[in-house]
Amino acid sequence: MRKYETIFILQPDLAEDDVKSVTDKVQDVVASLKGDFHRLDDWGTRKLAYAIRKFPRGRYYYLRFDGGAQLVAELERRLRLDEKVLRFLSVNITDEPEKKVAERKPVIEAAEAPEAAEAAAE
């Protein structure tokens, strides 16, 4: 299974019941197609770069899950059909850049930092 991130933007003026129904549908799609659900974060309401369907603001959600191509296709199909969703984007993150950063060796070790500062001062 591959790792995916999906960010979707909902209309900012939705009631909590409507928001809950959309997020529940998203989780149901992941579960029904045997995906592994990791997290769903509410990033809050933010100003959009440009108005989408006459909404200058949108409520952002971040979804992270593992699954196959069919899962992503079905999730995007359902988001596309829901009028409460303004935009969405799914990205394959199987090769995470965080791993590459973690493998890097620091230029100066923590113990060497005071010695380097003293040498530079002289």
Curated annotation (Swiss-Prot):
GO terms for cellular component: cytosolic small ribosomal subunit. One of its GO terms (biological process) is translation. InterPro entries: Ribosomal_bS6, Ribosomal_bS6_sf, Ribosomal_S6_plastid/chlpt, Transl_elong_EF1B/ribsomal_bS6. It comes from the Bacteria. Belongs to the bacterial ribosomal protein bS6 family. HAMAP family: Ribosomal_bS6. Binds together with bS18 to 16S ribosomal RNA. NCBIfam families: S6. This is Small ribosomal subunit protein bS6. It comes from Trichlorobacter lovleyi (strain ATCC BAA-1151 / DSM 17278 / SZ).
